[in-house]
Amino acid sequence: MSLTNTKTGFSVKDILDLPDTNDEEGSVAEGPEEENEGPEPAKRAGPLGQGALDAVQSLPLKNPFYDSSDNPYTRWLASTEGLQYSLHGLAAGAPPQDSSSKSPEPSADESPDNDKETPGGGGDAGKKRKRRVLFSKAQTYELERRFRQQRYLSAPEREHLASLIRLTPTQVKIWFQNHRYKMKRARAEKGMEVTPLPSPRRVAVPVLVRDGKPCHALKAQDLAAATFQAGIPFSAYSAQSLQHMQYNAQYSSASTPQYPTAHPLVQAQQWTW
């Protein structure tokens, strides 16, 4: 019994530095009652806890387990609380970022609809997004080619075109409506209204042969009558141009010799005689 007492006394007095064994027994006896009462840190911190704390503080391990000067990541490790706050902030701001990434630039027409939408109206938003279909290059080319041929399509033609390019008739109808409006707005901006094409211009050709005879000397009256019959008004020609044409006709008749027998019409008349 004396050996056990000395062992317990050595461990208690020298290591825990307790003043009396009676106090130890009282503290041990009171321990279960305190545990039954509830967690009270003020009552638990008796002379036993203080002695253990003093013993730990007297140990030579007062420095940290690693030297902060040798660790290159101390600037991030020193601000762990700031990182936690930033992570909470990112987690809180993540849902609106996801929602904005789905619709980065809502149009002006869709903004009031989005304001009116409620959390339960997610199906309507999905339907609206499905209606906005991006046409492929082949589909757009075929639609534009058909639009150049025919600006308005009937119901059977619309269905046939939709089946060819794998679209619905409603999508084809809406595309044609939008394209017509776009073309009309472009013409209005450029100031180009739809006008009928002008009739082809008629050019007056001088009469060289009349009634089987060459007309070398033309008078102004004959030329005016010829141009009037051709469809060009006489006012289109000035008097100076008429004189110039008459002079050229006279010069050509004077320079070229007259050979009546060489004319094919004259030969035909001679044979008929």
UniProtKB/Swiss-Prot annotation:
GO terms for biological process: astrocyte differentiation; brain development; cell differentiation; digestive tract development; negative regulation of neuron differentiation; neuroendocrine cell differentiation; neuron fate specification; oligodendrocyte development. Residues 20-38 have a biased composition (Acidic residues). The keyword Transcription regulation applies. SUPFAM superfamilies: Homeodomain-like. It holds the Pfam family Homeodomain. Residues 1-56, 90-131 are annotated as: Disordered. Residues 128-187 bind DNA. One of its GO terms (molecular function) is DNA-binding transcription activator activity, RNA polymerase II-specific. SMART domains: HOX. Keywords: Activator, Developmental protein, DNA-binding, Homeobox, Nucleus, Transcription, Transcription regulation. Disulfide bonds: none annotated. It is found in: Nucleus. InterPro entries: HD, HD_metazoa, Homeobox_CS, Homeobox_NK-like, Homeodomain-like_sf. GO terms for cellular component: chromatin; nucleoplasm; nucleus. Belongs to the NK-2 homeobox family. Transcriptional activator involved in the development of insulin-producting beta cells in the endocrine pancreas. May also be involved in specifying diencephalic neuromeric boundaries, and in controlling the expression of genes that play a role in axonal guidance. Binds to elements within the NEUROD1 promoter. The homeodomain is essential for interaction with OLIG2. Interacts with OLIG2. This is Homeobox protein Nkx-2.2. The gene is NKX2-2.
